[in-house]
Amino acid sequence: MLYLTKIRNAESEFTGNEQKIADFLRANVSELKSVSSRKMAKQLGISQSSIVKFAQKLGAQGFTELRMALIGEYSASREKTNATALHLHSSITSDDSLEVIARKLNREKELALEQTCALFDYARLQKIIEVISKAPFIQITGLGGSALVGRDLSFKLMKIGYRVTCEADTHVQATVSQALKKGDVQIAISYSGSKKEIVLCAEAARKQGATVIAITSLTDSPLRRLAHYTLDTVSGETEWRSSSMSTRTAQNSVTDLLFVGLVQLNDVESLKMIERSSELTQRLK
């Protein structure tokens, strides 16, 4: 039996740490060549022995055997797909009907939500919400699809009284970053965590004494190393994709949770502002 199938079949029996390992392996199967058990343990906040025991539970002698088998399964799957049809997005091919495409997209998004939520450290999330709530000024940075997620969050935070900026222009993002002060917060959204523009802004913000919060993947990256706090997102999208669909879904689940957490922290005043905002926009109709 294929290891990916074994992981899926045994999921109901996994402990908390085992579920973290399973989620990581499935989300990063295309990048496992560069992942060691030591690096993985550090990113997940668990011991290396937990990873070895997980591999043995699935029938492998150790993590190396499991990793190589998963790489082989992924490569074989790619070759099979490429031989029969054009690869349109993630697991979707040109041979798929619209019904099949809909099912695949829905499942991809469901997995992104399930796996991202499974990784939440709620004590750390509460701390991040408190840090944001006390910030005199908040800058949100992102590129492409991540910028859209950031813009949505900025609108939500403005609605409940926060001073926020989320500029699309990277030069403006950099300019704002260097003007941040101690106590200010920069929320950097980047799934790869390696975009030069976002990393540059995070470096500038940190240098100025601002708190950097990264919404990024589990993969080790320059942004992850720079951030004071990280909020992990998981996406089942393969290296080849036509658009960041499930990635945006995962990122939105994090930003929506931040927003609701901030509303809850100051519920009476926040709800008053939301109601006033609704009343004003109704008058524009």
UniProtKB/Swiss-Prot annotation:
The keyword DNA-binding applies. GO terms for molecular function: carbohydrate derivative binding; DNA binding; DNA-binding transcription factor activity. CDD domains: SIS_RpiR. Residues 37-56 bind DNA. It holds the Pfam family SIS. Disulfide bonds: none annotated. Residues 1-77 form the HTH rpiR-type domain. It comes from the Bacteria. The keyword Transcription regulation applies. One of its GO terms (biological process) is carbohydrate derivative metabolic process. InterPro entries: Homeodomain-like_sf (IPR009057), HTH_RpiR (IPR000281), RpiR-like (IPR047640), RpiR-like_SIS (IPR035472), SIS_dom (IPR001347), SIS_dom_sf (IPR046348), Tscrpt_reg_HTH_MurR (IPR022821), WH-like_DNA-bd_sf (IPR036388). Keywords: Carbohydrate metabolism, DNA-binding, Repressor, Transcription, Transcription regulation. Pathway: Amino-sugar metabolism; N-acetylmuramate degradation [regulation]. PROSITE patterns: HTH_RPIR, SIS. Residues 128-268 form the SIS domain. Represses the expression of the murPQ operon involved in the uptake and degradation of N-acetylmuramic acid (MurNAc). Binds to two adjacent inverted repeats within the operator region. MurNAc 6-phosphate, the substrate of MurQ, is the specific inducer that weakens binding of MurR to the operator. Homotetramer. HAMAP family: HTH_type_MurR. This is HTH-type transcriptional regulator MurR. It comes from Shigella dysenteriae serotype 1 (strain Sd197). The gene is murR.
